[in-house]
Curated annotation (Swiss-Prot):
Residues spanning the signal sequence: none
Sequence similarity: Belongs to the HscB family.
Any one of the GO CC terms: iron-sulfur cluster transfer complex
Lineage: Bacteria, Pseudomonadati, Pseudomonadota, Betaproteobacteria, Burkholderiales
Protein name: Co-chaperone protein HscB homolog
Recorded superkingdom: Bacteria
Pfam family for this entry, one: DnaJ
Keywords of the record: Chaperone
Amino acid sequence: MNSASDTHFSLFGLPEHFEVDDGALNAAYRTVQSRAHPDRHAHASDAERRVAMQWATRANEAYQTLRDPLKRATYLLHLRGVDVQAENNTAMPPAFLMQQLEWRESLADAKAAGDLDALDDLLAMLRGEKRARYQTLAGLLNGGGHDAAAADAVRQLMFIEKIERDTAEAIDRLDD
């Protein structure tokens, strides 16, 4: 198995890019897990079982990070020494803040009216916005030299994903 200093990407033999081949990631994860799975080391020494458990845990964490685009982008920036500062840097461009307010108002109005069509429309629009922003983020991350802009894009995507979840939950509640 690889050394503890390897990246999540190298653990699975993948290039350090924002775009990840899901099939290759899944196959590599299964391979690493099969080698590190604690059941495979049931008759090993305590130390060997502990190491196997650590590798299985590391593989799970790496897999969860790489399969989620937002976590993957944050991780790539971390590898480059850039802290996204999601907790303490909530500064956003005024246009994005206005858009966010409009989305929140649309969500509140649709929920209050019980308007499933409006919620569906908002969810579709948010998903389209998210797709477009992920494409932009990929260009920033893969183009090099745009790490600060990529960190800003990650923070904006966090807001978009939050309102997307809130909208999907509102739809689920109305469907019940």
